[in-house]
Curated annotation (Swiss-Prot):
Record flagged with keyword Cell division: no
Organism name: Aspergillus terreus (strain NIH 2624 / FGSC A1156)
Lineage: Eukaryota, Fungi, Dikarya, Ascomycota, Pezizomycotina
One CC-aspect GO term: nuclear pore
Name the UniProt record assigns to this protein: Exportin-T
Any one GO MF annotation of this record: small GTPase binding
Length: 1028
């Protein structure tokens, strides 16, 4: 059997073994894991002499571990495993002649021993730590802990036990945490003194002898200190041993591994400070440990002082010391903020804070970002603390300037690209992302400083920006791009305190002192020669700032032509990332400055001509060589950015100063090449040429986007208030026709339908009611047999907006197209669903269908639904609404269905005949013959059908809302039919449901007595009582 197991493990781990044989071996080993007796074979394999190969022993012990964790080994058998492993450990780790296992095997044994500790320390293995400690001696007569292999293994288990029961970062169930707490209590009661003593002895005996042992011992002290008596670590004997290890930091040259010992010693102090205790006790302990002196000595040690700014600088040590500074300062500030801290302790904490300020600045201003990031939490805490003080006593804000200014200067310095950075290099994308994330965090700190002392912040940033632009004025392109980028970045952030309600100005005057200063900065930036901004980062920064502070140009309109010229230079940038971003920023700028741009369209259209050529690329194709895998370089992203140029052209061409005939000319000059391209690609697109279809999609999107630039109209608000002149509309009528021709030829293409739907929504803004005669063709192209439910829902939403915008002109067209249009919607609703997404889209389509009918009714077009042409469809409409009103699986749609039925009732039920009108309907309303009876016999039963469904829960919040809407429908029916409805309820409907006379009278009494709001509240509670 042993031989079989060994063979199986060897085959499974052999990369060159036959795959079928390997699969059999894997299956065999996996069966062994679940075999109740498998662990016994594997334990024997592991401890056997002579030893098997490492992989066999590793897998064998893994099987034992799996069996133990799966509960396949009973407590008595666990004792057998313990005895077997301890005998092995004494044989291998407690004899000088033995060869210890590899670190991998040692970790696996430590894992098994740790599991046995969890299972048996409280129940049968009380001598656990004594047994392990016996391994640390070469012989019983040894006077010190002299057995290195045994010590290493002991410390490995000690650290493993902490991971199992003490590590707060490990997620545990309530039962697991309770067990961990119980084990910690047992250790503290039985063995903690002994364990702590062993650490001292090991650190003393091996302080200069074995760096691995010392490092492991320090890690054990540092990890266990969080849950043991602090006095076991913070005592003179232990501290002397720790200081001895810290002294390694003073060495100029360390042997291999010595740096890890030194860093582990610093980490012990960090863990000591991090231990939970009262604020007063923490302050006293920081003073007792003399941490200020420790940090000072470490900061002045050769690795951090003499070697700073050289390649020998020890960043690991710097980050380790920074962690100690961070946690110490956080605790000092916590003590200062804690209301229960005594005045005496607060005074001590204040002194400590002043002592640690140089340390904060030292590591916060460190040239390595990972070191700086380590102390950001304590800097943030410090600034929040100072902010609270300044808020409670503004007079103190000035006193803190000596603290704030160095921090602010350090923040600004850290926001600068370092000398080794190469902006835009694809190989450095990860570094760039990390730097931008650091800038965000530093920006938050800057805002905190501004909140404490705004004037200090204003002056500091003004100095940086002012100095940079003065240097730029004198030296031009000689200014380091990093300095200019920093100034621009600070200007961008400055708006957080200068901009109010999106503007630098209020009634033409700067908002505040910050806005005044920013206006000065803007003036200096704009007056600089754009050719001095030679680096892509600064060119982007320039454009971003112009867009963010466009209100500056609204108050300095004389500067607009120069800025436009600068942008026109940059939109042809050779670097794609800059070029595509500039297209978006250009559109943003001209949109915000539209009213003040002037008649510059001819120049702009001419300058942009080569960038308006549309070239569709398939995502799988290679690019022109300068693409990257980042988002900006993707095919879709580049075309999306190009669309911003089309919109920008539309905006500039339609400014008030451009004559009407010129507007039409510019629109035609942009559209004509697109029309030609569509005509050229239509035939291959029909033949399913994928690239041609994509080209048509892009062309249609461009047409719609140009129209968007020409009109401010947003679908769903109102009919376009000021349509373009007739000559311009005529040009876009051609665009509409071209889109329809493409759509009619390619309506089977999802991407073409998507583009056409977008274009339709934008063309409305430039065509107004002129688009209405084309509406049947749009519907035919966009509501095809292959249209998804999602597409139908989106188009229904768009039609709602058309109805709202042109309700006075759409009746005839709507009358003609309603029946075929609704038939397509019904077909979409009736199609079977496959999967969750399909069900979501079906629910959305139902709701948009109801919203469409509501839009028709709300805009006084209800007559179209019951016109002679559409009368045959009316019953189907009602049937679908009845179905939705009874759907217990979709309360949202059911609620909307009842709302629609109420609207139908108030529209077609004639004038209210009860004293208290249900819906405030006017007396002039004309009743649809027979609709009153229809409401009573068809609509009223629906109010009871939903709650009668077995799965209906009347206590559900959404269900109550549906019932309230159903109550509203009943109140509407009563408002239109009066006693006729009361008699029907009393004599027929309610008794037929088995309702007793008393309940019937209660219900009809409430219906006739309560107003709409009152009955909407009554009906859900009535149903709830019936369901009880």
């Amino acid at each position: 059997m042993e031989e079989q197991v060994v063979n199986a493990i060897q085959i499974a781990s052999n990369p060159s073994a036959d795959q079928a044989l390997k699969a059999q071996a894997f299956d065999y080993v996996n069966q062994l894991r679940s075999d109740p007796s498998g662990w016994q074979i594997c334990l024997a394999l592991f401890t056997k002499t002579p030893q098997h190969s490492e992989v066999v022993r590793h897998v064998a012990l893994e099987v034992v571990n799996s069996a133990a964790q799966a509960g396949l080994i009973d407590p008595q058998a666990l004792g057998y495993v313990r005895d077997g492993l301890m005998a092995y450990l004494r044989q291998v780790y407690a004899q000088e002649t033995a060869t210890p296992d590899s670190p991998g095997i040692q970790n696996k044994i430590a894992q098994t021993i740790t599991f046995l500790f969890s299972a048996l320390y409280g129940n049968g293995w009380e001598s656990f730590f004594d047994d392990l400690l016996s391994l640390t001696y070469k012989s019983p007569s040894s006077t010190g802990r002299d057995n290195a292999p045994g010590i290493v293994f002991y410390l490995r288990v000690i650290n493993s036990i902490h991971d199992e029961i003490g590590d707060v970062l490990v997620s545990r169930s309530r039962a697991e945490q309770d067990k961990a707490n119980s084990l910690k209590d047992l250790i503290r009661m039985r063995d903690m003194q002994k364990i702590a003593g062993s650490w001292q002895e090991i650190l003393s005996d091996w302080r200069d002898g074995n760096d691995i042992i010392v490092e492991m011992a320090l890690k054990a002290v540092g990890s266990w200190v969080s849950w043991i008596d602090i006095g076991l670590v913070v005592n003179q004997t232990m501290l002397d041993l720790l200081f001895q290890q810290l002294a390694r930091a003073q060495k100029a040259d360390l042997r291999a591994g010595e740096d890890k010992v030194r860093d582990a010693a610093v980490d012990v102090f960090t863990e000591i400070v991090g231990k939970k205790m009262k604020a007063e006790d923490k302050v006293d302990m920081i003073i007792f440990l003399n941490l200020d002196t420790i940090v000072s000595q470490l900061s002045n040690s050769p690795p951090l002082h003499e070697n700073r700014f050289t390649f020998k600088y020890d960043t690991d040590l710097a980050e380790t010391v920074a962690k100690l500074v961070n946690i110490t300062v956080c605790d000092i500030i916590r003590a200062l903020e804690n209301e229960s801290t005594t005045p005496e302790s607060k005074e001590k904490a204040g002194g400590l804070l002043q002592a640690f300020l140089p340390h904060i600045l030292r590591y916060f201003s460190d040239e390595y970002d990972e070191v700086c990031s380590t102390v950001i939490p304590c800097v943030s805490d410090l600034l929040q603390y100072l902010r609270k003080i300044a808020k409670s006593n503004p007079a103190l804000a000035a006193q803190h300037s000596s603290t704030l200014l160095p921090i602010l200067k350090a923040i600004i310095a850290k926001m600068r690209y370092d000398e080794t950075s190469s902006w835009g290099d694809e190989d450095d994308q990860a570094d760039e992302a990390e730097f931008q994330e650091l800038r965000k965090r530093l920006g938050v700190l800057q805002q905190s400083i501004a909140a404490v002392n705004e004037q200090l912040y204003i002056d500091a940033v003004s100095e940086v920006v002012g100095t940079t632009f003065e240097n730029l004025r004198q030296s031009g392109a000689q200014v380091d791009w990093r300095d200019l980028d920093l100034a621009l970045h600070e200007m961008f952030l400055f708006g957080d305190i200068a901009v109010k309600a999106g503007s630098l100005y209020t009634k033409g005057v700067p908002n505040n002192a910050a806005a005044e200063r920013l206006v000065e900065m803007m003036m200096r930036m704009v007056e600089s020669d754009i050719r001095s901004f030679t680096h892509p980062a600064t060119q982007l920064g320039y454009m971003e700032i112009c867009v963010r502070y466009s209100s500056f140009f609204l108050n300095h309109t004389q500067l607009i032509p120069g800025v436009l010229e600068s942008f026109l230079q940059l939109i042809h940038h050779p670097i794609k990332k800059v070029k595509t971003r500039s297209w978006y920023l250009f559109q943003r700028l001209v949109k915000q400055l539209r009213a003040h741009i002037g008649n510059v369209a001819e120049n702009v259209v001419g300058a942009l001509g080569d960038l308006l050529v549309i070239r569709a690329e398939l995502a799988s194709e290679g690019s022109d060589g300068d693409d990257s895998d980042d988002h900006e370089g993707s095919v879709d992203a580049v075309f999306t950015s190009q669309l911003y140029l089309f919109e920008a052209v539309g905006i500039i061409s339609s400014t008030p100063t451009v004559p009407t005939d010129k507007q039409a000319l510019y629109a035609q000059s942009v559209l004509s090449p697109v029309f030609v391209d569509m005509e050229k690609n239509l035939a291959p697109a029909k033949a399913n040429d994928e690239r041609a279809v994509q080209q048509i999609h892009h062309d249609i999107m461009a047409l719609g986007t140009l129209a968007k630039g020409f009109s401010d109209w947003v679908p769903g608000t109102h009919s376009p208030a000021s349509l373009p002149a007739a000559e311009v509309s005529e040009v876009f009528l051609q665009a509409s026709e071209a889109t329809l021709v493409a759509l009619e030829s390619l309506k089977g293409s999802f991407s073409v339908r998507t583009a056409a739907r977008f274009a339709f929504s934008r063309l409305i803004g430039v065509l107004g009611s002129r688009i209405l005669p084309q509406l049947p063709r749009w519907i035919d192209g966009l509501m095809t047999q292959t249209s998804s439910r999602d597409e139908m829902a989106l188009f229904l939403r768009l039609l709602d907006q058309v109805i709202f915008g042109f309700k006075g002109e759409i009746y005839g067209i709507l009358d003609a197209l309603l029946t075929p249009f609704l038939q397509r919607v019904f077909s979409g609703i009736a199609d079977p669903t496959t999967g969750t997404d399909d069900e979501i889209h079906l629910a959305e389509l139902k709701r948009e269908y109801i919203n469409f009918l509501l839009a028709v009714l709300n805009n006084d077009l209800g007559a179209v639904i019951i016109s002679e042409r559409n009368q045959p469809m009316f019953d189907t409409v009602i049937t679908t609404i009845e179905h939705f009103a009874k759907d217990v699986e979709d309360y949202t749609t059911a609620k909307m269905a009842f709302s629609l039925l109420s609207k139908m009732g108030s529209s077609w039920g004639g004038p209210d005949i009860t004293p208290d009108g249900a819906n405030g309907a006017t007396a002039q309303q004309v009743a649809l013959p027979g609709f009153g009876q229809f409401m009573i016999t068809r609509m009223s039963p629906l109010c009871w059908a939903l709650p009668a469904t077995p799965s209906f829960n009347s206590k559900d919040a959404q269900a109550k809302q549906v019932l309230a809407e159903a109550g509203g429908l009943q109140r509407t029916i009563y408002g239109k039919t009066g006693m006729e409805y009361i008699e029907y309820l009393r004599d027929r409907e309610l008794p037929s449901m088995g309702m007793g006379a008393e309940l019937v009278e209660e219900f009809v009494g409430a219906l006739s007595r309560l107003d709409l709001k009152g009955f909407r509240q009554f009906f859900p509670s009535f149903i709830q009582r019936l369901s009880a």
